[in-house]
Amino acid sequence: TKYHPSFEYSTPETVWEHYGLTKKRAESESGMNPKMFNSFLCGDKSSIEMCAVSNATDLKCPNSGLTYPPIGVYDIAKKLIPKSEGGLLDYSGQVEVISSIDLDKKDIPNDLRWGVYIVIKAQNEYVKNCFKDYGMVTDSSGSYSAIWRPYHYIGLELAQSIYSIVLDNKATGHTKNFNAEIASVAKKDLKAGQKLDGEGGYCARGRLISSKRSKQERILPMGY
């Protein structure tokens, strides 16, 4: 994804300047929804997606939410591993999203803005040797590697889920655990009783947090 801390306070009014588009070009000519595209930009959509992944797969939630490190594909296996093994993650088996730009808003080399990835770990020496023999990019220990795809097909993949439900009576994914929640974080001063406008809106942004913290602090979930 394309993430920068300054994007967290973007609204449907400011979203197009971050994409380098005019309002006319985006909305009138292309029919793009400013609230939806703002949710991609400010982190709401990434948090919601990783919440779903965490709760469906039992992958852990980072302690302080997603950090969006700017990492190219050839560094994924070197950096998206636990801190105890030289990486950036709080845990082994944790969700995270990477950014295609750095803090200066410059594109990083070999970015994965439009793609998806997964980090894998060898469970024995044979698999480690396979990583090496197959020319896979690994961390310094040779234990971690990454698999990525340069694109994800968004709504085009929906048909697969529909086929699975209709023909096999199976879901392609469903919630099995309650590891994570999306906290509503105010974008501006709010008044008591004010109605929030959900993801990509003007009032609040979403931050991925652990379900434990959500329950302890009685966090207000982000509305979709």
Task: Please report, for each region that a protein language model flagged, where it lies by residue.
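A contiguous active-site-proximal alpha/beta segment in oxidoreductase catalytic domains
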Residues: T1-E13
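C-terminal catalytic/substrate-binding lobe primarily of soluble NAD(P)-dependent oxidoreductases
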Residues: V15-Y224
